[in-house]
Amino acid sequence: MTQVCFVGDPEINLRYELLSRETARDALQTYDLGTPFHNSIGVETVSLGAAVALTNDLNWYIVRFVADVLVYDPSVSESEWLSRDLATAIRDDDVAHEESGRFLKIYGLEGDHGGTGGDGGSSPEADREIASEGEEVEESPITTGPSGGSEEGSAIDSGPRIGAEEPPRLVEPMYVTRTGPTVPEYDLRDVENTLVVRVTEDEFGA
């Protein structure tokens, strides 16, 4: 299974913005929604191609409400995430799996107590309430993504929990180049943990 995580802009409530809009809600309704990080929505899809297709279907909303899109595919790396652009390049065979790990963006994780996320206390009932109360807005037409879903016990929804605490917050990314087998140390601030995201060369140089 391939995981996709949409991280919201700091000034908005991402779950509300997406679930209060009919087209985005329809695109996400076949998935079990998790909250692996603060102000994020995480889903599991059947493949890397399905994950990229979902991000394309939600592009109108990504541009307006999302600060970052992260993709996790264990066939590429069991410990590192991919940027949306790199996931697309790998799907299109423009970048080989084994050549994808040179350019990195490392996030600090604040409030992480040993896991990489949890569900943040959300529930299907709360999501339905958001959907019913949300004001429908006029939006550009997009198609819904492929059918997907999470098996019971999936990593993104029933992995390490934070209990009553907030999911960890992604902070202050640091861009580094990997020149050996280890990842350079994150040194922008003191954090409990880090999240490594592989990016494209163009993203690294931007």
Where do the protein language model's features map onto the residues?
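A glycine-rich, hydrophobic loop/mini-helix early in the fold
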Residues: D32
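Short, surface-exposed beta-strand/loop "edge" segments at domain boundaries and coil↔beta transitions
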Residues: E11-E22, L48-A53, G114, F204-A206
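Short, extreme N-terminal segment that most often corresponds to the first beta-strand
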Residues: M1-L28, H38
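Hydrophobic alpha-helical segments
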Residues: M1-E11, T55-Y61, A206
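Acidic, proline/glycine-rich low-complexity IDRs
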Residues: S100-A206
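Short, conserved acidic/polar surface loops in the N-terminal third of protein domains
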Residues: L54, L82-D85, T116-D119
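Short, well-structured hydrophobic secondary-structure segments
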Residues: P36-V76
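Short, structured protein-protein interaction patches enriched in aromatics and acidic/basic residues
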Residues: L70-G108
